[in-house]
Each structure stands twice: as C-alpha cells, then as structure tokens.
Amino acid sequence: SSSLVGSEMCIRDRLKPVHRRIIYSMYQLKLFKSSSYKKCARIVGDVMGKFHPHGDQAIYDSLVRMAQDFSTRITLVDGQGNFGNIDGDNPAAMRYTEARLQDYTNYFFDGIEENSVDFKDNYDGQNLEPVVLPSQLPNILINGAMGIAVGMATNIPPHNILELIDALKLIIKKDKASLTEILKIINGPDLPTGGEIILDSNEKKQIYKNGKGSFNINAK
C-alpha cells in the first residue's frame, strides 16, 4: 500500500521515498560537497515539481532533518544557515537556508549512471527516478531507521560506521562468523547526541540475536 511504502524505510538504502527523491534531485543538480551551496527553496521546488508533489513544507522538513547532526548520526546533507537546534528552535525558512550533499552521500550513487539499480516513471511519467539508491554502505545500521506503517513498525538505532566496516570485513573474511565474534567489534548503538548506554553483554547479545529489546541512556 502507499501508506506502507511511504512510512517504512527501504532496507537497501535506509531511505523513505521523500529522502531518496531529495538526494537524487540534489545529485541531478550536481550539488556535491565540492560545489557551492544552493538555496533550499530551489531544491524543494525541484523535488516537488519532478518527483514528490506532496507539499513544500514536508519536503523541507525532511531535508532539514538530514542536515541536523543531532538528529542523524552521519548527515546526508550539508546545510548552511539556521537548520534548528537540539533545544527545539525551528530552522529558518527555506528561502534563507542553503544546502549541498555531504561527501558520505557519494556512496549512494555508485554505478547509478550504469543502470546499477532499476528506475521507474515519476508521478506524471515525464521523468525517471530510482527505485532504490545503490548505497555501498549499510546505511540502515549506520543511521538507524524509524517508521510506523499499517500493522508494523521499526526502530533501529544508529551504529558507529568504523565498527560496522570492521564487522563487514570479518564477515567477508570469515563466512560463518559468530554473533559473539561480531559483537566483539560492534560495541552497540552509537547515537548522534552521545551519552552512555546502559546495557550488559548478555542483554546486548539477546537484542542482536532476536532483533528486539531496549536500553537506557545516561546523558553526559
């Protein structure tokens, strides 16, 4: 259903449709880290006109969140201007703020020009958009995921990118690496705001084994 597709993130690139469309539009505009910033109003207009005709404010809110280092473990968007803060102050209007892609986001486009992923028609059949972005990194574990849809929900915490890469190296090198071996590398979730996670080793193992559980966080 459209509710399910719009609410749950795709496991392959950890993006909801609105996030994917923002990033792909910025890719088409060549807003890479090495380029100059562009007004968010222009980016939002491009996304809404080509791919996501669901209101400019919803698009802008999603763009802002991808640029907030207190909301996202590794930001996908490099924002310039007032993008809000952790105390709850709102970002400036899109006509004042500017954005471009982060270097990290380059890993989402490997081979996209060589048909490494499928494309589909946009809402009016005038443009093509990727079904999923060819991310080289496990972004769903790096930045976590949260979504609620009809009959299901997910809440995956973010993790440290260096620990995940080391764990992937172990899995590639040793096909049947045990969970115990993997958890010697991955210490647990790594949240954007820092803090101390209260979780003993047995609880941690059960959470990663079963995919369910909870933990407490002490602020620094």
Feature-to-residue mapping (PLM):
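Short, conserved phosphate-binding/catalytic loop or strand-edge motifs used
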Residues: H19-R21, K38-D46, V77-N85, M146
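Single conserved hydrophobic/aromatic residue that forms the stacking wall/gate
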Residues: S1-G6, I11
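Active-site cavity-forming subdomains of large catalytic enzyme subunits
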Residues: N82-Y123
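Non-catalytic interaction/clamp surfaces of large macromolecular machines
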Residues: K50, Y60-V64, F70-R95
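Intrinsically disordered, low-complexity regulatory segments
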Residues: G49, P53, D118-N143, I148-K220
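Extended, well-ordered alpha-helical scaffold/bundle regions in very large, multi-domain proteins
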Residues: F32-F70
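Residue-level signature of catalytic and energy-coupling elements of molecular machines
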Residues: I22, A67, G151
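N-terminal cofactor/phosphate-binding cores enriched in small/glycine residues
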Residues: R14-C40
